[in-house]
Each structure stands twice: as structure tokens, then as C-alpha cells.
UniProtKB/Swiss-Prot annotation:
Transmembrane segments: none
Subcellular location: Host cytoplasm
Subunit structure: Homodimer and homooligomer. Interacts with capsid protein. Interacts with host AGO1; this interaction targets the host protein for degradation, thereby suppressing the antiviral RNA silencing.
GO biological process, one term: symbiont-mediated suppression of host innate immune response
Protein name, as recorded: Movement and silencing protein TGBp1
GO MF: ATP binding; RNA binding
Length: 227
């Protein structure tokens, strides 16, 4: 337990529960360092093993990486992206970013982190205006423009099927957010038919948090605000 708590403390996770019971629940926002903390824990202590319901790591020489399946050895089990699948009964700790998923109701957290190291203060301000509790300290840019007057650029993402069809009909290469979940890009264009994140808040949140340097939102009338 000591090394587990030490790693969470190093990565600035805040303890929000006075008692700890298994599985220990750790929640964070995108870019908070959750995966990095898990990888460090695996390298520091061979008693731990981690599986993910998301995208597993590429295997490394040490054998200390986030896996798709258990090895079969008796180890302290960590489960990343636990919201996306069943939780083994013997799980020691479970991790997730609940803001990115509506699969199931998240468990009550023991540790949280709302600070993202991925994007900057402009995205922080936008997300807070839209109702999400996310903080950031770096520098980035956010632009909101009319979908019919400004061309999309760089990495283009969407979540609405009709938006994908519109982009394809104009020969624009774009990715549905499900295809790039967990990935990050320097510059992202998010194309949407909405003026507020209403249809699917989790998918909209994912589209709004894929970038590290700049975000361009293309929507009707260049308006994207809280409902």
C-alpha cells in the first residue's frame, strides 16, 4: 500500500475519502498523468499488474506495462478504464476518467485529480464554462467558428454520424471520436451540428480534449456554449 500511495502523491492525486477499501477508486481528467502513474507503479513494484478496458501498451523489455489481459499470476490487480467493462472481484485498485464515458455509473472515488497537463488555460476556461470541473496551467488556443465559413484543418474529429457523412461528402478526411479515443494531437478541429454539448456529453468532451496546442470548433453560427 505504501508504494501505491507514494506514487499517487507524486502525481498530485488528491485523497477525498478518509477510509480506503478495495477496490481503491482513482478518477482523473484527461491528461492528468493517470497512465503514467500506473506505469511507474508497475516498474517500482513487481507485485502489481494492470489490465485496461481501453488501449493496452506496447510490450516492453521489463514486462511492466498495461496489458489487455491478466497474466494468470497471483498479483495485486489494477484495472484501467474500469467503466468500460467488468471489474474482477479481486481488483486492488481501479482507474478511470468518468467524464469521458457514460457506460456505467462510476464508483465513489477515493482519489481524484482535476488538473490536466495536456492542454492549456483557454481549454480550461471553455470546459468550465460548459460545466466540466477541469483545470489546466499551460498555454493553448481555442477558436469557435462557423461550420460553413471556415475550413477544418489538421486532425479533424466528430461524433455525430450525420457530421461524418457531411465531411465525407466534401472529401474531408476525419475520424469519429471512437476511432481515436485515448489519442492526442497538437492541433484538432472538432466539427459538430450542436451549439451546446447536449446529444452526447461524453463524446463531446472527448472531442474537446484531444489537443495539446490548439482547438478549432466548427459549429452553426460560431456559437458553442452551455445550454
Amino acid at each position: 500500500m505504501d508504494v501505491f500511495l507514494q506514487v499517487l502523491n507524486k502525481y498530485k492525486f488528491e485523497r477525498v475519502s478518509s477510509t480506503l477499501n478495495k477496490p481503491i477508486v482513482v478518477h482523473s481528467v484527461p491528461g492528468a498523468g493517470k497512465s503514467s502513474a500506473i506505469r511507474e507503479l508497475l516498474k517500482l513494484d513487481s507485485r502489481f499488474e494492470c489490465i485496461t478496458r481501453g488501449r493496452p501498451d506496447i510490450p516492453n523489455l521489463e514486462g511492466a506495462f498495461i496489458k489487455a489481459e491478466r497474466s494468470g499470476e497471483s498479483k495485486l490487480l489494477l484495472v484501467d478504464e474500469y467503466i468500460e467493462g467488468p471489474i474482477p472481484e479481486d481488483a486492488f485498485a481501479i482507474f478511470a476518467d468518468p467524464l469521458q464515458s457514460t457506460a456505467v455509473s462510476p464508483h465513489r472515488a477515493h482519489f481524484i485529480k482535476t488538473l490536466s497537463h495536456r492542454f492549456g488555460k483557454c481549454t480550461d476556461s471553455l470546459l468550465r464554462d460548459l460545466g466540466w470541473d477541469v483545470q489546466a496551467e499551460g498555454q493553448d488556443s481555442v477558436q469557435i467558428a462557423d461550420i460553413f465559413t471556415v475550413d477544418p484543418r489538421e486532425t479533424i474529429v466528430y461524433f455525430e454520424p450525420e457530421v461524418g457523412e457531411l465531411l465525407r461528402s466534401h472529401g474531408v478526411e476525419a475520424s469519429c471520436i471512437g476511432e481515436v479515443r485515448g489519442a492526442t494531437f497538437e492541433h484538432v478541429t472538432f466539427v459538430t451540428s450542436e451549439n451546446s454539448p447536449l446529444i452526447d456529453k461524453a463524446s463531446a468532451f472527448q472531442c474537446l480534449t484531444r489537443h495539446t496546442k490548439s482547438l478549432l470548433i466548427l459549429c452553426p453560427d460560431a456559437t458553442y456554449t452551455a445550454a
